[in-house]
């Protein structure tokens, strides 16, 4: 048995390879992007499901640190200065503390408000990423892969404990405000 190889000009050979395989690679990329987006969607749904079934009625562990302050508020001894005090000696978290008290006042301290704010911040973050991607000169499959990557990082199952831990709402808010600020700066005409 013998084989006969036909010599071709390198440019013709490369053109034929490119033409023959570009459809296959686009198909593989589209399939990969679709599967990645589906995985991101399923993991997001599972994470949201876990967040809702693991939430329990009653203050979460980090809200117990605020019981003394809540009691002072009910006795009329509390002031807004508390919201500006450093938490744990490290940083001031005015808005999360305010959210804790609003959650306690309106929802009985079950963390429903802080969880909702954290999830809304993540959704808004993803929305800004999607807007940025629409403005870029990328292929649709590349946009899908990038958006799915952000979705996985924003809503992965490792985020569930962060959604439940009310203190972490500060990180979601600061990340969203930071991205929104950079987006606004990038959109300015000057």
Predicted regions and their residues:
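Start-transfer (signal-anchor) and selected internal transmembrane alpha helices
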Residues: 1-47
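Helix-to-loop transition at the C-terminal end of transmembrane segments
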Residues: 45-66, 160-162
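Juxtamembrane "helix-exit" motif on the non-cytosolic side of transmembrane helices
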Residues: 53-54, 103, 133-134, 155-165
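Membrane-proximal lumenal/periplasmic loop motifs of glycosylation machinery
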Residues: 54-59, 72-98, 105, 111-116
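Membrane-embedded glycan-lipid processing machinery
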Residues: 57, 88, 113-117, 159-173
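Transmembrane-helix motifs of polytopic, lipid-linked glycan transferases
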Residues: 116-140, 180-184
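Transmembrane-helix signature of polytopic, membrane-embedded enzymes
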Residues: 133-156, 176
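Membrane-interface transmembrane helices that cradle and orient dolichyl/undecaprenyl
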Residues: 173, 178-190
């Amino acid at each position: 048995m013998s084989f006969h190889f036909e010599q071709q000009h390198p440019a013709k050979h490369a053109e034929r390879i490119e033409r023959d395989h570009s459809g296959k690679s686009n198909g593989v990329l589209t399939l990969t992007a679709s599967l990645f987006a589906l995985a991101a969607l399923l993991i997001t749904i599972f994470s949201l499901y876990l967040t809702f079934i693991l939430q329990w009625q009653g203050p979460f562990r980090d809200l117990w640190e605020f019981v003394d302050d809540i009691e002072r508020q009910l006795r009329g001894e509390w002031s807004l200065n508390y919201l500006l005090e450093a938490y744990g000696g490290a940083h001031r978290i005015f808005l999360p503390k305010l959210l804790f008290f609003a959650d306690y006042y309106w929802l009985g301290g079950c963390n429903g408000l802080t969880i909702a704010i954290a999830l809304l911040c993540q959704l808004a973050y993803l929305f800004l990423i999607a807007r940025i991607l629409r403005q870029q000169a990328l292929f649709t499959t590349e946009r899908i892969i990038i958006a799915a990557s952000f979705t996985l990082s924003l809503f992965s199952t490792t985020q569930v404990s962060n959604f439940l831990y009310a203190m972490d709402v500060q990180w979601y808010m600061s990340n969203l405000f930071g991205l929104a600020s950079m987006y606004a700066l990038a959109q300015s005409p000057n």
